């Protein structure tokens, strides 16, 4: 078995799927760790080609020999909620001004998408987490079942 490489850095970025380029924020973040920026951009764009239009968070692990691995995460719940509600941005005063609404089924669908990144035992609890995020953005959730 090959010896383990020593990790020198962990970089977390949120980049538009299929649209990574050497311009900020990608270039400066990777350049500081000595990573080949174009190599990462090509690999990321190829891996996220099917998710175009979404923002896909990525965790990049940089090793001592300047090689790297990256792990894709699921799109942020806030972005998925904005898309589901059909609005551009959340409310500036979420508990006063309501800017849109989503159904409980839409919350469950988003929870299904994000389940691997959520700290929940089942889809029902995951949907409650998503509903809480929606409320904090000024989006009302219709049809929430009682506990």
Curated annotation (Swiss-Prot):
PANTHER family in the cross-refs: 60S RIBOSOMAL PROTEIN L12, LARGE RIBOSOMAL SUBUNIT PROTEIN UL11M
Coiled coil (UniProt feature): none
Lineage: Bacteria, Bacillati, Actinomycetota, Actinomycetes, Mycobacteriales
Record-level Gene Ontology MF annotations: large ribosomal subunit rRNA binding; structural constituent of ribosome
Keywords: Methylation, Ribonucleoprotein, Ribosomal protein, RNA-binding, rRNA-binding
Record PTM text: One or more lysine residues are methylated.
Summary of subunit composition and partner proteins: Part of the ribosomal stalk of the 50S ribosomal subunit. Interacts with L10 and the large rRNA to form the base of the stalk. L10 forms an elongated spine to which L12 dimers bind in a sequential fashion forming a multimeric L10(L12)X complex.
Protein name: Large ribosomal subunit protein uL11
SMART domains noted in UniProt: RL11
Function description: Forms part of the ribosomal stalk which helps the ribosome interact with GTP-bound translation factors.
One GO CC annotation: cytosolic large ribosomal subunit
Pfam families given in the database record: Ribosomal_L11 (PF00298), Ribosomal_L11_N (PF03946)
NCBIfam families per the UniProt record, alphabetical: L11_bact
Entry superkingdom: Bacteria
